[in-house]
């Protein structure tokens, strides 16, 4: 049984190109060592086209042999260790990537993306669990909605074990290059199968990797070789375009550098990109405007719920200079009538979420204006999801959401199913603890959709979730999509000198 599983995994490695045929005996022996087995007999390889099932079987063997505890985190640590034995060394990966890059950047990234899935760094079986649908908004177009189920939730054993582990500062964070090949521990994921491509960005050492959770096609992360904090300045725009010029089929964007409106990791400078067209990228300029001193740069306010200024030019240097002017102006801009305050009590509030891309030979830079001011009424942020939408989304609106992809919490999968069942029975939503938070919203959905039945209920709820997400994006917009909001937006643009 064990030998058949090991043989199947080795054959998988050869079939996918992770290892060469002549590596068969060597790899088999490494796997035997990992499973504390000194013997081997040639058995028929277990038939399994499903890598996850094969690895589950090997984890079962490890549990039986007392090598690991039977918990989700222990199993993840162990199966990553096994896949690390099949994953090519970083130098081999880099060499192949560079050779393919000479043929075309797209060929290189296609190969690397496949490698990251084949070696199980991207756990395809888990990514496939994510729920995805499209909400067609009448104003803003096709909005992507996802309920994220691929991020593993800590099991109780792992939580208990993590409390006993001595605090470690290595690697300094989840993004650091020191994660490449790292064995992991109960409170830090294993990364033996993790690879990142060294690249030069703005004359500095950076790395290209893929997100293990792939929220969209070829979801990549570009991170600094040094553990330095996020910062939005002129060099940010230069780095974004430096990357896009090297990989013109990818967009690249940065989270904002302030809390509330920033991403989950502000301590390590990094960007996110990929081979995907978001709703925001498809959005048209609602009105064109002129930036003083940059009359040759096409500029306009985007038809989008978040307040976005789009800049276009064939020369990225012009966009870098123009964006720097906009950023400096926005950092110090106050408009009390529009409730825009550059700072309060010495705390800065204004920043930008920038996204760079190349479209048919023309470079684009979208500048989403952000502000993280809080008030007594909105302690989590005025331009943050408001309380009435927290039953769907209360987390920060980061780069991915700004572009039009909702990453919603996993709890919604079960909550929406329960909600559908209760609503179809005309039950009392407020009396069911797990979905009571949705009661007011559910009542409104019922009023808006008297036609709701078993056949259409799921679709209706999905579309209504999409509507809520657009409302959340509107909350994040510092200038609302109203005549008054657009007037205030124009006032800012005209102030840029």
Protein language model features and the residues they cover:
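Active-site microenvironments that recognize anionic phosphate/pyrophosphate groups
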Residues: 1-222, 226-229, 303-305, 320, ...
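Helical scaffold of the NTase/Pol beta-like nucleotidyltransferase catalytic core
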Residues: 193-195, 225-252
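Catalytic or ion-translocation cores adjacent to nucleophile or general acid/base/metal-coordination motifs
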Residues: 235, 244-267, 273-334
């Amino acid at each position: 049984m064990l030998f058949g599983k090991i043989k199947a995994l080795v054959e998988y490695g050869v079939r996918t190109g992770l290892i060469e045929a002549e590596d068969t005996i060597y790899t088999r022996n490494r796997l035997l060592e990992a499973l504390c087995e000194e013997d081997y007999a040639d058995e028929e390889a277990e038939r399994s086209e499903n890598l996850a099932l094969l690895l589950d079987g090997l984890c079962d063997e490890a549990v039986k042999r007392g090598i690991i505890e039977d918990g989700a985190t222990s199993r993840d640590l162990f199966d990553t260790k096994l896949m690390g034995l099949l994953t090519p060394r970083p130098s081999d990966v880099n060499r192949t990537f560079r050779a393919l890059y000479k043929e075309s950047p797209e060929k290189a990234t296609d190969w690397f993306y496949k490698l990251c899935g084949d070696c199980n760094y991207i756990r395809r079986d888990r990514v496939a669990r994510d729920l995805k649908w499209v909400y067609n908004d009448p104003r803003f177009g096709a909005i992507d909605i996802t309920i994220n189920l691929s991020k593993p939730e800590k099991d109780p054993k792992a939580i208990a074990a993590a409390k006993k582990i001595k605090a470690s500062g290595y690697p300094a964070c989840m993004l650091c290059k020191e994660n490449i090949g790292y064995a992991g521990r109960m409170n830090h994921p294993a990364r033996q199968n993790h690879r990142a491509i060294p690249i030069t960005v703005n004359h500095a050492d950076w790395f290209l990797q893929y997100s293990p959770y792939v929220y969209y096609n070829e979801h990549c992360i570009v991170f600094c070789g040094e553990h330095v904090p996020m910062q939005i300045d002129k060099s940010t725009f230069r780095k974004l375009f430096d990357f896009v010029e090297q990989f013109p089929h990818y967009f690249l964007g940065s989270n904002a550098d302030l809390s509330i409106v920033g991403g989950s990791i502000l301590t390590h400078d990094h960007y996110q990109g990929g081979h995907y067209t978001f709703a925001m990228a498809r959005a048209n300029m609602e009105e064109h405007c002129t930036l003083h001193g940059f009359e040759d740069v096409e500029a306009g306010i985007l038809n989008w719920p978040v307040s976005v200024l789009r800049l276009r030019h064939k020369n990225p240097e012009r966009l870098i200079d123009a964006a720097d002017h906009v950023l400096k102006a926005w950092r110090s801009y106050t408009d009390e009538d529009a409730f825009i305050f550059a700072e309060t009590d010495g705390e800065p509030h204004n920043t930008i979420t920038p996204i760079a891309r190349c479209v048919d030979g023309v470079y684009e830079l979208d500048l989403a204006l952000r502000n993280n001011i809080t008030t007594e009424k909105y302690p989590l942020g005025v331009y943050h999801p408001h309380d009435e939408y927290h039953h769907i989304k209360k987390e920060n609106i980061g780069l991915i959401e700004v572009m039009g992809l909702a990453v919603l919490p996993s709890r919604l999968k079960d909550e929406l199913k329960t909600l559908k069942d209760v609503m179809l029975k005309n039950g009392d939503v407020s009396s069911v603890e797990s979905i009571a938070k949705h009661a007011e919203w559910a009542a409104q959905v019922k009023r808006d959709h008297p036609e709701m039945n078993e056949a259409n209920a799921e679709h209706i709820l999905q579309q209504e979730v999409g509507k809520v997400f657009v409302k959340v994006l509107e909350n994040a917009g510092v200038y609302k999509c109203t005549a008054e909001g657009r007037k205030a937006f124009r006032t800012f643009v005209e102030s840029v000198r």
